[in-house]
Amino acid sequence: TARNLITLGSPHQAVKATRLRKFVDKKYPGNFFKNINYISIGGEVEINSKETSLLTKLIARNSYKSISGNKNVSGDGLVPLSSSLLKNSQQIILPKTVHGGIFGKNWYGSSSKVREWWDLINWK
């Protein structure tokens, strides 16, 4: 039986939500199952820093705007931080972390980043 659910940069909220996302949010809002320890992890990176790829520099602002309605927010180069943090979950913010390997070198699955977020989790 699973006791913990970890999300890594998942967009939990969006201004323009798809039908499926609206359905899931309505039927199973936030941390719906009370016996599960929800952990949402979001990355924060300066878009024009050396940690990001050219792709991040080109698409981040438009991606943030399509998800949150605001292009001038922080995030992981694809998903705004506010969207990646699930309401009523244990929330972990990772500095200098991008969404995936194509967005830069330090992403949620990088060895150093996995150790970082793993050690910050309050396991139940």
Locate predicted features:
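Serine-dependent carboxylesterase/thioesterase catalytic core
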Residues: 1-55, 76
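C-terminal catalytic-base region of ester-bond hydrolases, centering on the histidine
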Residues: 34-124
